[in-house]
Amino acid sequence: MDKIKIALQYIMPKHLLSRLVGKLAAAQMGSVTTAAINWFIKQYKIDMSEAAQSEATAYASFNDFFTRALKPGIRPLCEDNDYIVHPVDGAVSQLGPIKEGRIFQAKGHDYSSLALLGDQADDAKRFEGGDFATIYLAPKDYHRIHMPIKGTLSKMTYVPGELFSVNPLTAENVPGLFARNERVVAIFETEIGPMAMVLVGATIVASIETVWAGTVTPPTGKKVFTWDYPTEGPNALTLEKGAEMGRFKLGSTVVMLFAKDALDKFADGVEPKSVTRMGQAFAKIED
């Protein structure tokens, strides 16, 4: 059955399906939308007591529901300056060192940091010998993405690609998954060096937003787009630790890259398959 599920992903019209679902998710259909949201809450056992708006009727569209805000204070931020924090609610897929420019995906599969970053060689060099962490957001999870550490935006890259599912089954079976799917790469300058936040799209998750650019939707095609941003002066964009930096529609994956000697160790309990909660300690900064 698992092989059939993977095979279907290769032949299904993923981009067309994602566009159709995207239009439905953005539609405001009153009682139909409310009924669908209630079904989704029940199906995925979503704890709406954490949401700023706990009633399904508060959301005009599925997208509003998927990107719902949490109640203030529900995710307390680790204020220890020796630690960076979890950027999202989800589960750790993999983490560890970047070895010879390769990132571990699953047993028998890895991929290059160069490919992940859209073949931006200068960017890839900045993370040689560093560390990575991959976090999967399930459909039930809170879908906003936050800053692990204070950083100033220096570059954004949009990389077109496939829209495979990014669930654990697919990660274990599709080679180079995260370097094949459509993605947005945001690079920040931080006190511990450069940090890349890679927001990976997936089936029916073709819409990725950032707080500075809104929905990132370059023209369709195979061209990589890059934007450079000032890191000093009045137009520089600096986001504080814990601040929102982007959001997904439905679930997806975030891959974080850090420079060599930026991190000392991952926090206790942070390992593959461990549950993450935004704001909790994720890794200790190198002294």
UniProtKB/Swiss-Prot annotation:
Reactions listed under catalytic activity: a 1,2-diacyl-sn-glycero-3-phospho-L-serine + H(+) = a 1,2-diacyl-sn-glycero-3-phosphoethanolamine + CO2
InterPro entries listed in its UniProt record: PS_Dcarbxylase, PSD-B, PSD_type1_pro
GO MF annotation: an example: phosphatidylserine decarboxylase activity
Membrane topology note: Peripheral membrane protein
Cellular compartments annotated: Cell membrane
UniProt entry keywords in alphabetical sequence: Cell membrane, Decarboxylase, Lipid biosynthesis, Lipid metabolism, Lyase, Membrane, Phospholipid biosynthesis, Phospholipid metabolism, Pyruvate, Zymogen
UniProt keyword annotation of RNA-binding present: no
Coiled-coil ranges (or none): none
Gene Ontology CC entries for this record: plasma membrane
An example Gene Ontology biological process: phosphatidylethanolamine biosynthetic process
Cofactor remark from the record: Binds 1 pyruvoyl group covalently per subunit.
Active site, UniProt feature: D89 (charge relay system), H146 (charge relay system), S252 (charge relay system), S252 (schiff-base intermediate with substrate)
UniProt KW Cytoplasm keyword: no
Pathway: Phospholipid metabolism; phosphatidylethanolamine biosynthesis; phosphatidylethanolamine from CDP-diacylglycerol: step 2/2
Post-translational modification: Is synthesized initially as an inactive proenzyme. Formation of the active enzyme involves a self-maturation process in which the active site pyruvoyl group is generated from an internal serine residue via an autocatalytic post-translational modification. Two non-identical subunits are generated from the proenzyme in this reaction, and the pyruvate is formed at the N-terminus of the alpha chain, which is derived from the carboxyl end of the proenzyme.
Domain of life of the organism encoding this protein: Bacteria
E.C. number(s) listed in UniProt: 4.1.1.65
Site (Cleavage (non-hydrolytic)): G251, S252
Known cofactor(s): pyruvate
Residues with Pyruvic acid (Ser) modification: S252
Assembly with partners or alone: Heterodimer of a large membrane-associated beta subunit and a small pyruvoyl-containing alpha subunit.
Similarity annotation: Belongs to the phosphatidylserine decarboxylase family. PSD-B subfamily. Prokaryotic type I sub-subfamily.
Role played: Catalyzes the formation of phosphatidylethanolamine (PtdEtn) from phosphatidylserine (PtdSer).
Name of protein: Phosphatidylserine decarboxylase proenzyme
Organism of this sequence: Shewanella pealeana (strain ATCC 700345 / ANG-SQ1)
